[in-house]
Amino acid sequence: MGKVLGIDLGTTNSAMAVYTNGEAAIIANKEGKNTTPSIVAFTDKGEVLVGESAKRQAVTNPEKTIYSIKRIMGLMCEEEKANEAKERLPYHIIDRNGACAIEVAGKTYTPQEISAKVLMKMKEDAEAYLGETVTDAVITVPAYFNDAQRKATKEAGTIAGLNVLRIINEPTSAALAYGLDKKEAEQIVVYDLGGGTFDVTALETGDGVVEVLATGGDAFLGGDDFDNRIIDYVADEFKSESGIDIKADVMALQRVKDAAEAAKKELSSATETEINLPFITADASGPKHLVTKITRAKFESLIGDLVAKTIKTIEAVLKDAGLSKNDVKEVVMVGGSTRVPLVQEEVKKFFNKELNKSVNPDEVVALGAAIQGGVLAGDVKDVLLLDVTPLSLGIETLGGVMTKVIEKGTTIPAKKSQIFSTAEDNQPAVSIHVLQGEREFAKDNKSLGMFELRDIPAAPRGVPQIEVTFDIDANGILTVSAVDKGTGKSQEIKITGSSGLSDEEIEKMVQDAEAHKAEDEKRKAVVEAKNQADALIHQTKKSLDDLGENFDANEKAGIEAAIADLETVLKDDNATKEQIDEKVKALTEKSHKLAEAAYAKEQGGQQGAADAGKKADDDDVIDAEVE
């Protein structure tokens, strides 16, 4: 195997490194820079510019200059974040089969294609630097990226001519680069605030092992959002002075964006900066110039709520990991936006300890990816990465309940199976609805996909055994399969169509799950009671039909009346578990003699109605049915 390229494919900038001569080293691009802007531009002459050259011409070509494409990777157009992206980004975002894509000069490009152009440049620059062909790569992604986003990232690599050996999480990669796996076992937190995404991950490291304990973050929080706060402030000030809305002029807005980014960087070392943009626009009275001063205090007031949001995420991650602030031995700062003084101050204040800033925050993730490349190439020994799935995975079962197959926080790769059955007699097919989240009901969780297992042989409900298997590979990409154990017929789906969960959504799901826990459990108890009652009615009616005239007419009438009472309660959407249980008890008592009569029959074999709805003896069979 040749050299493996470690790539940090960032929202704002990307970096690359390689493991050679016993250490990871950053590879400079052809321009001599250690980072490459993740920007692609299309010129009127049909040229495609990537990196610095694309960034330089953005002011004169804003609608054909594509930046922050990572923000719409795997995003569905119906999502709220898609509307935010459309409002903020100057290029044309369109709907392509439900997913976000972009349109430039009448041509449609997917986020994968745009990202691939950045990766192609990096591959070419690496080959020029190393003097050899590079085909293998390890690419990093935010820890909360879902299956579709991870697969899209891998596809971008493939389009760029790379063989993507592994997709790994950015904070895990950073921990490797800091050499934290070489120390004694300890708990660390990686705080990763980049240009467009934010990640907090709690890890346990030591003795060559890096294990993720919990992760959180936001796909729409980063340096871009800090820039946007400055842009909004400057635009509002200019409008109040001149009456002109410069946001309506894409070329003027691009100039303000560039100035805002520069001001943000200057305020990391200076206490005041000036934005000076002559001839920004014009009206009937002549040209207008934009000149305004911004102090660090003003900047911090503009972004204070965003920084506070990151602290809340730290609290949630520590809670999920079962750690206190005092348990954390190292706080590692990653990402260019961690240079902002307010960010450092608030994180330091929260943990009450000095922060680890010993490695360049723009380069650390790429260095870690190169080390993982060395592991895969066999050049690095005794290093093991253990990542986790950020949310539970499961399927929808009878009554709209989500039945979990893989629990949140499970170390990946992971493979787990459960046995389900049919909900109706002679049911010819089952629909497998794959879900992600922490709520009790399917509708409250994220839908990842759906498929059907067909041609199930005719059989009574509960008889067919459908084995559903969830398989998450080391890249975090999920495959779900279903097998009819009676016939061997199978079907599977690789989850690729979902839009991706931002960690904001993940955090909201967890919070919602906690807030609605009592309510959800109450609703779930009603659904389970209804399912059990329905099974009891089904079995009782079947026993009555089997016995026919051999059963006492008065007893039969009493049972039928009890069935009718129970069916009436089941039709009531507002029925409580207690009301259902009361009618179930009445029918069960009435059915005792029916059970005795059934067992007394010579052919036997009929199960008593009182046992209906109980769990099968097979420990692998769970008490849930697939609609």
Swiss-Prot record:
Q: Which CDD domains match?
A: ASKHA_NBD_HSP70_DnaK-like
GO MF annotation list = ATP binding; ATP-dependent protein folding chaperone; unfolded protein binding
Mark out the compositionally biased spans (Low complexity).
598-611
Q: Which InterPro entries match?
A: ATPase_NBD, Chaperone_DnaK, Heat_shock_70_CS, HSP70_C_sf, HSP70_peptide-bd_sf, Hsp_70_fam
The induction field says: By stress conditions e.g. heat shock.
Question: Which residue ranges have biased composition labelled Acidic residues?
Answer: 618-627
Keyword annotations: ATP-binding, Chaperone, Nucleotide-binding, Phosphoprotein, Stress response
What Gene3D superfamilies does this protein's entry cite?
1.20.1270.10, 3.30.420.40, Actin, Chain A, domain 4, Substrate Binding Domain Of DNAk, Chain A, domain 1
Q: Which residues carry this modification: Phosphothreonine?
A: T197
Q: Does the keyword Phosphoprotein apply?
A: yes
Show the segment(s) annotated as Disordered.
598-627
The family note in this entry says: Belongs to the heat shock protein 70 family.
The record describes the protein's role as: Acts as a chaperone.
**PANTHER family given in the database record:** HEAT SHOCK PROTEIN 70KDA (PTHR19375)
Name of the protein described by the UniProt record: Chaperone protein DnaK
Species of the source: Sulfurovum sp. (strain NBC37-1)
Q: Which gene encodes it?
A: dnaK
